[in-house]
Amino acid sequence: MSDPIVTSSKMEKSAEFEVTDSALYNNFNTSTTASLTPEIKEHSEESRNGLVHRFVDSFRRAESQRLEEDNDLEDGTKSMKSNNHLKKSMKSRHVVMMSLGTGIGTGLLVANAKGLSLAGPGSLVIGYVMVSFVTYFMVQAAGEMGVTYPTLPGNFNAYNSIFISKSFGFATTWLFCIQWLTVLPLELITSSMTVKYWNDTINADVFIVIFYVFLLFIHFFGVKAYGETEFIFNSCKILMVAGFIILSVVINCGGAGVDGYIGGKYWRDPGSFAEGSGATRFKGICYILVSAYFSFGGIELFVLSINEQSNPRKSTPVAAKRSVYRILIIYLLTMILIGFNVPHNNDQLMGSGGSATHASPYVLAASIHKVRVIPHIINAVILISVISVANSALYAAPRLMCSLAQQGYAPKFLNYIDREGRPLRALVVCSLVGVVGFVACSPQEEQAFTWLAAIAGLSELFTWSGIMLSHIRFRKAMKVQGRSLDEVGYKANTGIWGSYYGVFFNMLVFMAQFWVALSPIGNGGKCDAQAFFESYLAAPLWIFMYVGYMVYKRDFTFLNPLDKIDLDFHRRVYDPEIMRQEDEENKERLKNSSIFVRVYKFWC
């Protein structure tokens, strides 16, 4: 069957350039040719010198690297494209496991302890259910945009500049970069808190140094090391979540531990909501909302893999379905089970004010019921999970920073890619930011955790709002310019109204979080400036960058005119007739399949 994809006339045809190591290989051969003598000892010594020289030489700038500027956009937006690309050395097994496990870290495994302590299990479940709907709407919007613009430089970070405004794009993209920059020290701090479950008198800096050096070693030796370590880390995380679900059900039913049947005991005593007035309980739900955004953070990254799929029209619905299962099983189900097995007044939960406030609720779900050995295994896997997210942050942040430099949004000196495909200067900058993690040895460890987690959580609100608002603007621009949606390869199941709801809900969360930050829970309704900036720092930071870009560039465009948006820039246009023919053939093929195949296709 013919290909349904018709390339637009305005779509760029930039030739890919593969950075090779031929020069290094020739240098290596030159340096070792002289060693081919009868003396085996001399040959061995020269070979070792050649390997050392090759490793050192790999840190030099890739000779072919240069930037090309494209001014094709009608609204004047420039796309800075490099004709080299970062090395892609990961295999399909790496990508599959990362899509399942990446993002399962501090937000889900540790930060929810404070939410459970302050708000109770009822607020925890309500907050996660509400954010789950927005997550699905965002995934649908991102899927439609990703299939339509699979090769757009900057991917979903570029949507804002094209469909909204350049100032909105600058502020949101930089905040997204800052989010990943803060994740590294955040995870290092969390790792020290996790270790304190075993020994709370140990110097946290010892483990911070070990984990920090380990992460630097991985990333300065290339992407292959990152791919293999992430495959192992994510495998452990998925197995732990599956085992935790089974264990929690067994404990609750009285099959393990010393408490017998638990059922909904903790929802009655100490209760499903934390003590206090109705306003305090509502504040608890508002607090959980931002915590949930932090936990769901990273799920939007599935869009990045769309341009690597042979048939995005078919793979995107599959990815959307899997995101639903990830939401229902990994997030909602585990939150419900934690609420059933961990009382919210336990003094080991972070934020409870107890003497040992460093335990994850996943660990407490087993340890407080006197289940032996298992809590230590869970805590060890949580430690692996935390290091895994720090590993991902040190992989994503430098590449995002390098991309910002290529687009003209960051200093050009950060656009340095060495011969092994490492964004070297950006990697050094991100590594220096990780030094913030050494505050773990100070008494302000939990306070630093709150600051960093708040930046990351609110950043997701801006990023997701940008994706959904760009989707709305894309649909409107298509209508204004007389384009048919039949040209779109994948249309969001939730339509444009899902994006409207998501943007509206995010605005409500911003306002609710402002209230909670200004008058935090447990402060007697009094305002607290320090607590406000701890919880709401990302918002004034975004406003500063948004206004600063407007003033500096003297560009006060609030929204790009719909009729001026270049819809064809890096757009993939599909033939409606061929798509209908494909859909009919797929329906007929599915109709003639076995019941097992039909069930599988329906659910997966």
Swiss-Prot record:
It is found in: Membrane. GO terms for molecular function: amino acid transmembrane transporter activity. It is a multi-pass membrane protein. GO terms for cellular component: endoplasmic reticulum; membrane; mitochondrion. Residues 117-119, 191-206, 260-284, 345-377, 445-449, 524-531 are extracellular. The modification Phosphoserine is found at S14, S79. The chain crosses the membrane at residues 96-116, 120-140, 170-190, 207-227, 239-259, 285-305, 324-344, 378-398, 424-444, 450-470, 503-523, 532-552. Its main location: membrane. The keyword Transport applies. One of its GO terms (biological process) is amino acid transport. Residues 1-95, 141-169, 228-238, 306-323, 399-423, 471-502, 553-604 are cytoplasmic. Coiled coil: none annotated. It holds the Pfam family AA_permease. It comes from the Eukaryota. Keywords: Amino-acid transport, Membrane, Phosphoprotein, Transmembrane, Transmembrane helix, Transport. Involved in transport of isoleucine, leucine, valine, cysteine, methionine, phenylalanine, tyrosine and tryptophan. Belongs to the amino acid-polyamine-organocation (APC) superfamily. YAT (TC 2.A.3.10) family. This is Valine amino-acid permease. The gene is BAP3.
